Amino acid sequence: MRHNCCHVSFASILKILNFLQAFIGISIIIYSIWMLDQYNHHVPVDPPPSQPPAASSPDSSYSFSNSIIEINSVSDSLKNPIDFVSGIVLGSGGGDSGFNLRSLDLPAPWFIYCFMAIGILVCIVTIIGFIAAEAINGCCLCFYSILKTLLIIIEAALVGFIVIDRHWEKDLPYDPTGELNSLRAFIEENIDICKWVGIVVVAIQLLSLLLALVLRAMVSPRQSELDDEDDFENPMSRARDNLLGPQANQTSSGSSNIDNWRSRIREKYGLINSQSHTPSA
């Protein structure tokens, strides 16, 4: 299918935006590999000192009643799934018995793995965007728009988690690599630059999504118009063939009749000449 100049222009802009996002994703992956190498070849950060065990209470019935109260509070939280999920995300479990992300058994460099997963996800979505911009296909553009929307929602959820929960670092598992604290300190020292970088990244992603939706809307009517033109041209060509078919048959039959007539005339003329030459001989 041929594409007009407008389709090619929008696709070229979408390729440029995807190239910028691919650069961001590759940078995240390279930085994650560097952090993992630093963690593997250097002494990891010591874990925080564990709290001393609480002194045993002389009254065993009091401790038993406290455990019953904790079990009841957990069961009450399970009855309300929305509150339970919000308690998991925000870490507000109601006291020490609340379930938070620190209770999860994660590998030691979990922050590095999560950071690398974000870079890989950005690169995958970017590759799909390149394919969609090159093919200018409706299905590819629709799939790319869905993935880009999900990626933006995940990023918005992470930002919302940090903004809503003022003590979000206490709700996350302990990072023995120390890279989370280093990244946070770097962002706090260069908060103005990081704000502008974040705004530019979000603007690039939103503009990519908008271009994909516009290009998807432009491709669909064009494809339907071409299908309608094909459907209109096929009956016309068939009707033209039906009209021209008898004439072609008549022409071929007429030419064959003329050839037969000429061959008969030649045979007759040849016969007459032979008869005229025999008496003279």
Curated annotation (Swiss-Prot):
<keyword id="KW-0926">Vacuole</keyword>
<feature type="modified residue" description="Phosphoserine">
    <location>
        <position position="256"/>
    </location>
</feature>
<keyword id="KW-0812">Transmembrane</keyword>
<dbReference type="GO" id="GO:0005774">
    <property type="term" value="C:vacuolar membrane"/>
</dbReference>
<feature type="transmembrane region" description="Helical">
    <location>
        <begin position="111"/>
        <end position="131"/>
    </location>
</feature>
<comment type="similarity">
    <text>Belongs to the tetraspanin (TM4SF) family.</text>
</comment>
<keyword id="KW-1133">Transmembrane helix</keyword>
<feature type="transmembrane region" description="Helical">
    <location>
        <begin position="195"/>
        <end position="215"/>
    </location>
</feature>
<feature type="compositionally biased region" description="Polar residues">
    <location>
        <begin position="247"/>
        <end position="260"/>
    </location>
</feature>
<comment type="function">
    <text>May be involved in the regulation of cell differentiation.</text>
</comment>
<protein>
    <recommendedName>
        <fullName>Tetraspanin-20</fullName>
    </recommendedName>
</protein>
<comment type="function">
    <text>Promotes intracellular multiplication of tobamoviruses, probably being a component of the replication complex.</text>
</comment>
<feature type="topological domain" description="Cytoplasmic">
    <location>
        <begin position="1"/>
        <end position="15"/>
    </location>
</feature>
<feature type="topological domain" description="Cytoplasmic">
    <location>
        <begin position="216"/>
        <end position="281"/>
    </location>
</feature>
<feature type="region of interest" description="Disordered">
    <location>
        <begin position="226"/>
        <end position="261"/>
    </location>
</feature>
<feature type="transmembrane region" description="Helical">
    <location>
        <begin position="144"/>
        <end position="164"/>
    </location>
</feature>
<keyword id="KW-0597">Phosphoprotein</keyword>
<keyword id="KW-0472">Membrane</keyword>
<feature type="topological domain" description="Cytoplasmic">
    <location>
        <begin position="132"/>
        <end position="143"/>
    </location>
</feature>
<feature type="topological domain" description="Extracellular">
    <location>
        <begin position="165"/>
        <end position="194"/>
    </location>
</feature>
<comment type="subunit">
    <text>Homodimer. Constituent of tobamovirus replication complex.</text>
</comment>
<feature type="transmembrane region" description="Helical">
    <location>
        <begin position="16"/>
        <end position="36"/>
    </location>
</feature>
<feature type="topological domain" description="Extracellular">
    <location>
        <begin position="37"/>
        <end position="110"/>
    </location>
</feature>
